[in-house]
Curated annotation (Swiss-Prot):
Belongs to the CobT family. InterPro entries: Nict_dMeBzImd_PRibTrfase, Nict_dMeBzImd_PRibTrfase_bact, Nict_dMeBzImd_PRibTrfase_N, Nict_dMeBzImd_PRibTrfase_sf. It comes from Pseudomonas aeruginosa (strain LESB58). SUPFAM superfamilies: Nicotinate mononucleotide:5,6-dimethylbenzimidazole phosphoribosyltransferase (CobT). The lineage of its organism: Bacteria, Pseudomonadati, Pseudomonadota, Gammaproteobacteria, Pseudomonadales. Its EC number is 2.4.2.21. One of its GO terms (biological process) is cobalamin biosynthetic process. This is Nicotinate-nucleotide--dimethylbenzimidazole phosphoribosyltransferase. The keyword Zinc does not apply. It catalyses: 5,6-dimethylbenzimidazole + nicotinate beta-D-ribonucleotide = alpha-ribazole 5'-phosphate + nicotinate + H(+).
Length: 351
């Protein structure tokens, strides 16, 4: 494993295919721009896939799981045992992402990077077990440097498996009690923003719980604040194993030329970290939705992202990204299947 592989060159979109796809959109039997953002989505996908008529038939979903030591500060409404129990639910097909992946015909893998209470014999889960969760980041860095590197590499390896399966779109999901706190702490550091502006209820905290979470994050920022300018240090000190894996996956997608569809708040923070590690990866990231967590909007703005959906989602797992896939597919189908003015013998607008 080469150190700092994430700095390697990212693939470039195909400008010729972008031009050809845009020209095709202008010839289709509709007023120019009348399909709104669906037109630009199709054009962007054409450039990224290097095909005038892109398609998204083969989807890959990986849910990365890891627990967080900061739960010891009382920042979550749920116990950490839920993480391992949800892994079982994922592979048995009962979780939201399991249902959605099945409906999409997508491959679904589950990677345990470090649950606090693992179910070791659980078939269908990749057990990497880099740690029994992260350290409590109000007392010490969440991860050691080697742990963080291994978690980044785990995301990269997942994309390699997706590539070997011929996948055209990668969706990363996450599961980990305490990970909205970790994501909010990272966002505060990366955006140089106060916790009060970015912290939300996560899995269901009341107002006093949210205030307590913000205070915990401020303590962590005071401890690790000297490293805010370094995205790797921010990731390892304030992040989580699953967040690092997501960042690694997004970077690998850009390097391999695979489009990544980013899910909610936690995934978007991982994407922001990935872009800070290698800005060129931004072109390969599409953003599925704007979630209910207040910090999500700030992260999306920092990434100049235009999410496809706004449904008040805050589940995670990759579920919001899975919900956006049919929209992307319909953009491709319209782009490829509509007739041009010439083909339909319909009068075009005057030149």
């Amino acid at each position: 494993m080469s150190l700092q592989w994430w700095r390697d060159t990212c693939r470039e979109a195909d400008p010729q295919m972008r031009r050809r796809a845009a020209e095709r959109q202008d010839r289709l039997t509709k007023p120019r721009g009348s399909l709104g953002r669906l037109e630009q989505v199709a054009i962007d996908l054409a450039a990224l896939q290097g095909r005038e008529r892109p398609s998204l038939e083969r989807i890959w979903v990986t849910v990365f799981a890891g627990d967080h030591g900061v739960v010891a500060e009382g920042i979550s409404a749920y116990p950490q045992a839920v993480t391992g129990e949800m892994l079982r639910n994922f592979v048995r097909g009962g979780a939201a992402i399991s249902v959605l992946a099945r409906e999409l015909g997508a491959g679904l893998e589950v990677v345990d990077l470090g649950t606090a209470f693992p179910l070791e014999a659980l078939p269908g889960v990749r057990h990497l077990r880099l740690a029994a969760g992260t350290a409590n980041f109000v007392e010490a860095p969440a991860m050691g440097a080697e742990q963080c590197l291994l978690a980044l590499e785990a995301g990269r390896e997942s994309v390699r498996r997706a590539e070997q399966a011929g996948s055209q779109l990668f969706i990363g999901g996450e599961m980990g009690i305490g990970n909205t706190t970790a994501a909010a702490a990272m966002a505060c550091a990366l955006l140089d923003a106060p916790a009060s502006a970015l912290v939300g209820p996560g899995t269901g905290l009341d107002a006093s719980g949210v205030a307590h979470k913000a205070a915990v994050i401020e303590r962590a920022l005071a401890l690790h604040g000297a490293h805010r300018a370094d995205p790797f240090e921010t990731l390892r000190r304030l992040g989580g194993l699953e967040i690092a894996a997501l960042a690694g996956a997004y970077l690998a997608c850009a390097q391999k030329g695979m489009v990544a569809l980013v899910d909610g708040y936690i995934c978007s923070v991982a994407a922001l970290c990935a872009v800070r590690l290698n800005p060129a990866c931004r072109d390969w990231l599409l953003f599925a939705h704007s979630g209910a967590e207040p910090g999500h909007r700030h992260v999306l703005e920092a990434l100049a992202a235009q999410p496809l959906l706004d449904l008040g989602l805050r589940l995670g797992e990759g579920s919001g990204a899975a919900l956006a896939v049919p929209l992307l597919r319909q953009a491709c189908v319209l782009h490829a299947g509509m007739a041009t003015f010439a083909e339909a013998a319909v009068s075009d607008r005057p030149a």
